[in-house]
Amino acid sequence: MPGSLRKMPVWLPIVILLVAMASIQGGASLAKSLFPLVGAPGVTALRLALGTLILIAFFKPWRLRFAKEQRLPLLFYGVSLGGMNYLFYLSIQTVPLGIAVALEFTGPLAVALFSSRRPVDFVWVVLAVLGLWFLLPLGQDVSHVDLTGCALALGAGACWAIYILSGQRAGAEHGPATVAIGSLIAALIFVPIGALQAGEALWHWSVIPLGLAVAILSTALPYSLEMIALTRLPTRTFGTLMSMEPALAAVSGMIFLGETLTPIQLLALGAIIAASMGSTLTVRKESKIKELDIN
């Protein structure tokens, strides 16, 4: 990784991660608008195909050399990246965006919990859990939530956890350029699946520009930024900071879909933001991960 990335201030990866999450939320809103045209698998195919082309053109990954011990994590990174996209888009066909994001977040939350070493880290995880608990419709509306969609969102969360863990080891040497190889692996698996299910509509001229925008907002930009953050932040800090995702999804729904938030939901968002801020304020520069400890 270039020396400039290695010497970046401790707060900069946090800002980079927040920008990546905001980009993903914008891309998710746009992607859902394409579902009536090509379906969730088709949007996944567009996102990965076009996003991979952008990443390959920018990073020129054929010049990279990966050590033998990095190849298996790289494979897991690519497969989990594709699985996370595919399962999440399938889930939001039948589950509201905010609920799907909250359920998907169980993956990075588990990473934060199991990577915790200090009592103060556990406090931030508990705050994030409380926020997620009150964001989910656990009262009368839960019976109206599609269980299959919820299961798909949880599956996306599991892929997200693998993405975090494998991404740190796979990207330790080449940083954000690694995402181009990971995206290529994901595309080789999931683009054919999506193309078969979407049919000829996938490549219609009116769909391609929107698909390109989704690819930039949801793949090329955020995953490149996340790879920088992954290799510069402790596992627990990265996982807890991702608690901003459900909050951003809820705010996005309020702005673009006209959804209103109850006082309890506002408190839940406050708890999640507090967890993210607490994790940020207690991050220690010397604790940045150089090699992932999986024990």
UniProtKB/Swiss-Prot annotation:
Q: Does the keyword GTP-binding apply?
A: no
Q: Please indicate the ranges of residues that lie on the Cytoplasmic side.
A: 1-9, 60-71, 115-118, 168-175, 222-237, 284-295
Query: Which GO BP annotation is one of this protein's?
Result: threonine transport
Q: Which residues form the EamA domain?
A: 30-135, 159-278
Q: What is this protein called?
A: Threonine/homoserine exporter RhtA
Q: Which GO terms describe its cellular component?
A: plasma membrane
As for membrane topology, the entry says:
Multi-pass membrane protein
Which NCBIfam families is this protein grouped with?
A: PRK10532.1
Q: Which residues lie on this side of the membrane: Periplasmic?
A: 31-38, 93, 140-146, 197-200, 259-262
Where it mainly occurs, coarsely classed, is membrane
Per its UniProt entry, which superkingdom is the organism in? Bacteria
Subcellular location(s) of the protein: Cell inner membrane
- MF annotations from Gene Ontology: homoserine transmembrane transporter activity; secondary active transmembrane transporter activity; threonine efflux transmembrane transporter activity
Q: Which SUPFAM superfamilies match?
A: Multidrug resistance efflux transporter EmrE
Which key words are in the record? Answer: Amino-acid transport, Cell inner membrane, Cell membrane, Membrane, Repeat, Transmembrane, Transmembrane helix, Transport
Q: What is the lineage of its organism?
A: Bacteria, Pseudomonadati, Pseudomonadota, Gammaproteobacteria, Enterobacterales
Source organism of the structure? Escherichia coli (strain K12)
Q: Name one Pfam family in it.
A: EamA
Give the similarity note.
Belongs to the drug/metabolite transporter (DMT) superfamily. 10 TMS drug/metabolite exporter (DME) (TC 2.A.7.3) family.
Protein's job: Involved in the efflux of threonine and homoserine. Can also export other amino acids such as proline, serine, histidine and cysteine.
Determine if Cell inner membrane is one of this entry's keywords: yes
| Transmembrane regions listed in the UniProt entry | 10-30, 39-59, 72-92, 94-114, 119-139, 147-167, 176-196, 201-221, 238-258, 263-283
